[in-house]
């Protein structure tokens, strides 16, 4: 009986492994945060507008609402990178009182897929912490590795957060 049980457990484990080969990668996460010597409300005022990414992120030249309004779940924006490509994102959650919002990419030239992201501003001492967390997978057929995708998103988040800090601290 013990041998039958052990055989069944091994068979189930092997079946699970072979079926996992056909599933998408479990996903990647970028989690960046930065401490800022400014009140949370001041920092939130910089990042809260869904059509304001180009005002605080140095990589973007344009951000236009194409559907809905700022702070309205379902709003969509077209954002343009400084080197030209444009993509579309949709606001999936927004809470002004909690200083947070979430969004997802609808269409993008980036080598990532199933991208969702959340930005929050929280108090810390006399200042704030801005946290930007994204989940995604590497787009099939993009020719990029998971490390490439991770590096791209990590770099984008860090560049944005560094600039928010400069703006909020007046440097």
What are these regions (language model features)?
Residues 34-41, 47, 51, 111-112, ...:
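Soluble non-cytosolic domains of exported or imported proteins
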Residues 81-129, 135-137, 167:
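Hydrophobic-ligand binding "helix-grip"
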Residues 42-46, 53, 77, 91, ...:
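Hydrophobic pocket/interface hotspot
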Residues 1-4:
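Positively charged n-region of N-terminal signal peptides that target proteins for export
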Residues 17-67:
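Hydrophobic ligand-binding cavity/cleft-lining segments
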Residues 7-15:
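Bacterial N-terminal signal peptides
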Residues 48-58, 83, 93-96, 138, ...:
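Sec-exported extracytoplasmic/periplasmic mature domains
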Residues 18-19, 23, 129-131, 135-171:
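A conserved amphipathic terminal alpha-helix motif
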